[in-house]
Amino acid sequence: LACYFNVFPGSDRTYVMLEGLKENMPKAMALFEEILADAQVNKEAYGNLAGDILKKRTDAKLNQGQNFNKLIQYAIWGPKSPATNVLTTAELQQMDPQELVDRIHKINSFDHKILYYGPEKPQAVLDIIKQYHNVPEQLQPVPAAIEFSQQETPENRVLLAQYDAKQIYFSAVSNRGEKFDPAIQPTLNMYNEYFGGGMNAIVFQEMRESRGLAYSAGTFLITPSKLKYPYVYRTFIATQNDKMIDAMKAFDEIINNMPESEKAFNLAKDALITRLRTERITKSDVLWSYLN
């Protein structure tokens, strides 16, 4: 059929995707619906999957960057976050795969949207969906999701995660609870590009190129991924253990007294303009941008 499907479970939605040739869409969709309705348990495959997940977790603990990323997640979200909303080792090992298969069988019974990107006419797509998409007469509401909150930082706090390595990772996180404001986005983008973005940014040039105090350094104000989330300000340094104090002092100085550079400013401005001129939302990304 020259088609394939995939499943994407996320922190706030799960979706299945079917792609292929236009002329094979009816047959592909019929087979796809059959798989969803009649998926069978394979205990050996589940055992291998659980083993792979646990192996990846064990390997991640041996990676300094992975450990540091989890510390950042804790600083931003607190003890309950999307990163911690996973099955424990015991839950994975004791899980009955039939429970997972039952969830697959029920996926069409919940409220859902259908997105189509392709050459077929709208009415033809609707006819195929009506013929092959198996849904009950009454759809069920999607179960309420777990709500996670990004934690404000009203006072200074230090979080330490011991890791035996020859360099340290340092980050400062600030959340004042400020919600998304489209009016400040141009200034925010310019600040990130000029001050903390890439290799031409002030932070990188000062910390690595001019002072030799860091392997990598950056700072940026993160735009909320959803309207319910606030802006989060983050800094980052990777440096040798014996340069930690000097690097942190220099970083504070640069942040509180931002150096001015006409050359760096123009480079940042040109980079933003080039990005705006060349970036396009195309194809199926138009649909996803609308949903998001």
Feature roles, as predicted:
Residues E99, I202-V203:
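Short Gly/charged-rich anion-binding patches and loops
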Residues L1-V142, R211, S216-N292:
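Charge-rich, well-structured scaffold segments of protease-associated domains
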